[in-house]
UniProtKB/Swiss-Prot annotation:
Gene source species: Caenorhabditis elegans
Region described as Disordered: 416-456
Keyword match Cell inner membrane: no
Principal location class: membrane
Domain of life: Eukaryota
Protein name in UniProt: Bestrophin homolog 18
Membrane topology note: Multi-pass membrane protein
Amino acid sequence: MTVSYNQSVATSRPWTFLALIFRWRGSVWSAIWIQYSVWLGLYFLVSAIYRFILSAYQQQIFVRLVDYVNSRMSYVPLDWMLGFFIAGVLRRFWYLYDIIGFIDNIACSTATYIRGDSERAKQYRRNIIRYCELTQVLIFRDLSMKARKRFPTLDTVAAAGFMMPHEKANFDLIQYNYNKYFLPFNWAWALVYNARKEGLIEGDYYVTVISEDIKKFRTGLAWVCNYDWVPLPIIYPTIVCLAVHMYFFVGILARQYVKGSEIDPDMIDLVFPFMTSIQFVFYMGWLKVGEGLLNPWGEDPDDFETNMLIDRNLAMGLKIVDEGYDKTPRLEKDAFWDDTWVPLYSEASAHEKRYHQRQGSLAHIKIGRSVSQVRMVPRDGRRASIVKERIVNVKPGSGIGDILRPSSLLNLMKHASSSRSLERQRSPGSFRMETLTPGSPTNTPIEPIDKIDKKK
């Protein structure tokens, strides 16, 4: 059963992590306690031999051996190896979950496009869902131990109602050296085709929609099989597991508290390997994460709930195509038809802090408040005669003002005294655009460009 902890960490608090640390099921403690107990027992055994059995001369040799091994513990690149290993395993895990197969899309398209209240139409809709789910059952029982225990044989699949006796007879007629996962999908597609021929589907496009949903479902299950058939190369998890276990096996000797150490002459004899125990929890726990995600079809606490998904898909699919078919509510005006929409909250939540408006981080910045006129020119001054320029009259308090659009710099100087402005009415707080046109008087006097340049 998947361990759910989302409610415990719904809100971040300084003590939130305690809700996870003191859990047992699915925790790091339940994953490493056996290895840690064995390692700690061996550590104290070696420590007792050093303290109470070895002679003084033998202790000196032991100290030199401890120094030699401890100085070379960094030769094993655990951080690098575990980091790449966990990253690769985690990507496989989430991809498998994405394609594991939820039947909702097939059910919704089937209920929408296969029309009719007759028993025949209802049989079409229900059997399409059942055939798709039958394939998922056949695949899961070959991948997941939980599903295998539930359906040890095909007879148990038929007894559970996923396959009718005559369907199992047709299934057994095909003698094939490989898996027959394709057969229920063929039945489902054939039903879609027959429903179109009988007029239960109104157009070929709707046949394509239903067929595409079935195809996506089938493709996802095919990739699930591919990932099970071709796992990560065995040398990869082997070398990572070997590195972690060998590191701490050598650490039984290297992390002993000894007297007269040349590497750490000021070593405090704590008897208990406190810092090494912390390191053991982190590294061994990290390795257990990878081992748990390497094959999510087992019976670990966080493995996929295949039986739950099978039950959920069949129940949800049949409910959608049966009770959910053609049950549209009566069409009426909504509550905001004649009124402005105002967000409503419960009285308890209405006093909470307002949520952040999704705007740009600089949307509230107003540039050009102290400038009365802004001249927009091309970066290349040699093109001033052929490129349109703009002069913006900044309105007080708005940050953006009237935009004057001469056709060119020469036209601006020629027609500045004989042009008029065309005003576009805007709402309060917005800006107006004034365009200079040749031969028209202007209401807003504009200084010639040469005077503006002299002022600069």
